[in-house]
Amino acid sequence: MNIIDELEWRGAIYQQTDEEGLRKWVEEKQISLYCGIDPSGDSMHIGHLIPFMILRRFQNAGHRPIILVGGATGTIGDPSGKKEERKLQSMEQISKNVESLRVQLGKIFDFEGNSAASMVNNYDWTKDVSILDFLRDYGKEFNVNTMLSKDIVASRLEVGISFTEFAYQILQAMDFNHLYEFNDCRLQIGGSDQWGNITAGLDLIRKKQGENAKAFGLTIPLLTKADGTKFGKSEGGAIWLNPEKTTPYEFYQFWINTDDRDVVKYLKYFTFLTEAEIDELAKQVETEPHLRAAQKTLAAEMTKFVHSEEALEQALKISKALFSGDVKALTADEIEQGFKDVPTFVAEDTEANLVDWLVTLGIEPSKRQAREDVANGAIYINGERQQDLEKIMDASDRIENKFTIVRRGKKKYFLVSYK
């Protein structure tokens, strides 16, 4: 199957500059193509994954992906999709962000073999361009009227846009031209809001490399959820690829909670399952939605892809423990992941009567309520029901000598650590 056909059945193409030409080009040749990301933060979130998944599909089809981290463009900020001017970051912070993104992107692509990926930083070829060189060699090629008509600029004219952000499309065009000339890069991929920047790059390539220069642009539809809200956010905020910001367990849970109306679309966008495999899961969504087979598959595939098989096994173990209440077998690391959002308390490193301990920490409001809950079997320590009013809490009630998990009733959890 032609890679363009695959992207079409996955619903992953919004616009193409020359569909017929690109389709023929990828059938006849191994091409290099690129997608960029600016280091505005130290982690990608799952929304950033969308264009890079397309890049990875091209790699799987035998083409060479180029991942561009914008050490130069990141100092300015892309105005696309923004209603106001971005706050500029220090060069030191941008450099740190670049390195963090390199690590995350490095896990997504294969950097060996005939279709090996490469990673570049546009700061390397932009840092020595003087202001006079910029104006003479590049600014001269851009018509201000054309630049003003681009959606990314036109949408900001009423509230105002600085020359810095106005010139962003020139810098991105310079990137495409540089990669065309020195890396034989023929295709740029981006979100639907990048159309203006991509076409600016194609115009520059034709002016610099000749009218017959073969280069293409492809954009991806804006991904929204069935309820109309923006994809990539949960009630707690963005879902990050950095495991220190979003744990693998939280990452897994995001996908497992996907709405039935969205799950097939996400399987097409984010997994490498075949059309037949996804069709089978789609049938199960219709006939046996309670089994959530599609969601389980999506969550497993994504957690493995972004993190690892081991991270998936941990997420499954935590999920099973929380569902069953049997939490004693969890490791300290797994507890930190699974109980990240529950009320947390710090206890003295001493022995104490269970009832007093619960009240002192604030888990129970009074001794009377604590005694009642213990006597009625509503208190669990590390998954085990406690009904002994005289029980002494000691080191044996700690997991890896770090945590005690308290449950009140069926689902109310508390996490206790020690001084």
Swiss-Prot record:
It is found in: Cytoplasm. Its EC number is 6.1.1.1. Coiled coil: none annotated. One of its GO terms (biological process) is tyrosyl-tRNA aminoacylation. L-tyrosine binds at residues 34, 168, 172. A motif ('HIGH' region) lies at residues 39-48. Its main location: cytoplasm. InterPro entries: aa-tRNA-synth_I_CS, aa-tRNA-synth_Ic, Rossmann-like_a/b/a_fold, S4_RNA-bd, S4_RNA-bd_sf, SYY-like_C, Tyr-tRNA-ligase, Tyr-tRNA-ligase_bac-type. It catalyses: tRNA(Tyr) + L-tyrosine + ATP = L-tyrosyl-tRNA(Tyr) + AMP + diphosphate + H(+). Residues 352-418 form the S4 RNA-binding domain. GO terms for cellular component: cytosol. SUPFAM superfamilies: Alpha-L RNA-binding motif, Nucleotidylyl transferase. PROSITE patterns: AA_TRNA_LIGASE_I, S4. GO terms for molecular function: ATP binding; RNA binding; tyrosine-tRNA ligase activity. ATP binds at residue 233. Catalyzes the attachment of tyrosine to tRNA(Tyr) in a two-step reaction: tyrosine is first activated by ATP to form Tyr-AMP and then transferred to the acceptor end of tRNA(Tyr). Belongs to the class-I aminoacyl-tRNA synthetase family. TyrS type 1 subfamily. HAMAP family: Tyr_tRNA_synth_type1. This is Tyrosine--tRNA ligase.
